Amino acid sequence: MKHPQHRSGQSASSALPDAASRPAWFASASASCLAAVLGLAAPAAHAAAPAGTATAQVSDTPSRTRSLTLTLMDGNGPAPAPHTPYRVFVTGSNDEILDTPSGDGILHGVTDAEGRTAQIRTSLPHTEDDFTLIRRIGDGPWGHFFQLQRSGSTEPLPAWPYIMTMPQRWGEQWVDLGYTTRQGATAYFSHDVPAGSVSLHIDADVTRDSKCFAELDAVNRKFAQNDADGARALIGAMRCTRSAEQKLDLARLLLAAGQADLARHWLLQTRQRPFPDMFKPVDDADRRKRLEVERLLGMPDLVLEDSNVLQARQSKKRAADATDLANNTAYFLADFPDYLPQAEEQARRSLERVGPRPYNQGTLGWILALRGQTAEGLRLMRLAYRDLPRDEEIAAEYGLTLWRSGQKDLAARLWDQAQRECVWGVRLHAALREAGYPHPYFHPADSEPVNAYRARCAKPRIKAKTAGL
């Protein structure tokens, strides 16, 4: 289980994470400057402002049929977005788009060569300002978008650079970047993780560097248009790939675009240091940033190398509140069968350095179970679970070990309790899918079981007893 400072789980009623919970390489948004409103994938009650312009009429008169042009901001201003996935619906109205494939009044598609949508039909006449038209990423049943407004008003904040991230198994991963539309809207990120939390970052080093951000945005758009060759040509011409941090930013973007191999290439470039920097030690902060990306890319050999260096330096400083890197590395390595011996060594190093804690006992128990020592692994995970029953990773690993060892009734009891306590997260999601456990979140996104579960989990909860497990 991860050290408490680095847990990835969230409750079932999760909202936009606080700035304090975001990765250190992102600065929090200034509350005195901006406000962000989260848009969820609900078919009704859309509240975002429009983002398209009509092309069917010379003057924008109300009409029941029209086509819109997806206009996106970039470093040079607004421009049509050809061959780009989009999402469009009638904003804040009792009316809806007719004949959509899903019947929910929301139309998904890809713009044509001029950036236009398909023809849209509605029951009532509308102007272009009655629609919300935004770029779309992904094609899952769950989704999010944001709208930026100036602090203290409903005035939108257009052309503002942003990055959206989502917690994954091994860290906070970029899922999109770009500029807000003229109505302050981000793209719509569509995914298949039930109740997955998405964060918006608008005040970071990468968003403040306008020239470099524009280069990343251009590459992102090419990949969104399914133009991999065009994206690679832009990467080859980029100027912002000189520093290690710029290379890591590009690697994060490439991972978001589904280009993991190319992302690994740029991650490895950060380890090729030019003369005379090659003779200087890598700064701890830079190594930590590199370690974050190595974890996201699933590179256990590099994670182990960088973690060991940081642990050695950490032991010299003896910081009482330092992250337990040995435990976190052990938990990461447990996902790679060939690295289980190193994982166990790291887990035992954690217990030796900081003493037995619920989280590192849970980590060692999980690793021992994976190495065939199921009884001892379950004993340690039981101790961890009694102290941290609402930790989604402990609930996932302990329950999954019980289930794999044939104790399926006990695993079901544990997960029933987690469901009652509204425990949820990406790891628990994967474990329940493997076991075929019938969780409410495995129903359609706007179904009655999902809505009822969300409503219940939004209420105050009382900690349940766990002694029987």
Language model features with spans:
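Short, ordered, surface-exposed loop/turn motifs in non-cytosolic proteins
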Residues: 77-93, 153-168
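Short, acidic Ser/Thr/Gly-rich low-complexity loop/linker segments typical of extracellular
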Residues: 96-116, 170-185
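Alpha-solenoid helical repeat scaffolds
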Residues: 216-217, 248-249, 281-289, 324-328, ...
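Residue-level recognition of tetratricopeptide repeat
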Residues: 220, 252, 292, 331-332, ...
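Short coil turns that delineate tetratricopeptide repeat
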Residues: 241-243, 275, 320, 355, ...
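Alpha-helical adaptor scaffolds
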Residues: 323-387
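Terminal, low-structured helical/coil segments at or just beyond the last alpha-helical repeat
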Residues: 412-469
